[in-house]
Amino acid sequence: MNCLVIGGTQFIGRHLVAELIQGGHTVTVLHRKPKHGFGRRVKNILADRNDPRAMKAALAGKSFEVVFDNVYDWQRGTTAAHVEGTVRAINGPLHRYIFMSSVAAYGDGLNHHEGDALAPDDAADLYVRNKATSERALFRLHQRIGLPAVTLRPPFVYGPANPLYREAYFWDRLRAGRPIIVPGDGRRLMQFVYVKDLVTAALRAMTEKAAVGHAFNIANARPVAQSEFVDALAKVCRKPVKFVRTPREYLLRAGGHPMGPRLYFGLYLDMPPITEVTAKAQRVLKFKPTDFSTGLAETYKWYLRHNHAAKQDYSFEDTLLKHAPVLPPATKV
């Protein structure tokens, strides 16, 4: 099929483009850079997806059968209006419009099914609001004009080539023999999905007729506690882990923030838990997640080959460790 990948040069998009090429599809990447690194097999469109006029001009005279809308602008936000503008700029009949949403679209809460209400239009968190309103806009277009929309709702995505300082954050510290700061008792839940599993789900959404007009939760079936997550990372790199359980309020008061620059538990990982149930994806998309330990092992292999970053600055953590009140070990999770 003739596929347009919006945001195909980073994490999820790079894996997706590679699989599309492997599958013999024609691939075009739309992004804001003049080059994409995929070679001649992949066409390039230079445009800012947050600019409806630029999108219309860039896509004029071009048609696609499938659109994978992966990109989110963390600095400016990507709104429902931006997503609608992209849909209206696409020429020709579409076979599928696959939108990368997020578990965050639910706003909060545990064990969500796809039919649960999404966050309201006035949700305080910009990312939450934009994902929820974008999904609503796409499904309105599905009802009104027959847009063959599918939305995917992953939680934390991990895997090789992750540009976010998440898995590598902990491996850097474990390999350096440093203690790991855990906010609170370490029992806050997290849910993950392997990037290659997410890409497989997107590809199946492209071909499965029953997927049209539906949202899908794409995740490992079982959430893990924060301390379990670190234990799994330590097991993969064969390093002992020393937890320092510290009140979350102290970490924030001292200047720590989940989004940085003063991180204390990786980038954007210490968030109120939102979890989801994946039975629908298993049934319709035949979704079978990779075992967490297997996915982490593959990710660690990539980390070892590519971990050539500058020496990390641990001064903020050293200050925290020096002055932080330490909580007693949590009971078995």
Where is each model-derived feature located?
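Glycine-rich Rossmann NAD(P)(H)-binding loop
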Residues: I6-G7, G159, P183-R188, F216-P223, ...
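NAD(P)H-binding glycine-rich loop region in Rossmannoid oxidoreductase-like domains
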Residues: H36-G39, K43-G92, F99, A105-Y106, ...
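Conserved Rossmann-fold NAD(P)-dependent oxidoreductase catalytic core, especially the SDR/UDP-sugar
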Residues: E84-A132, A137-I145, V150
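Conserved SDR Rossmann-fold cofactor-binding beta-strand/turn motif
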Residues: R153-P154
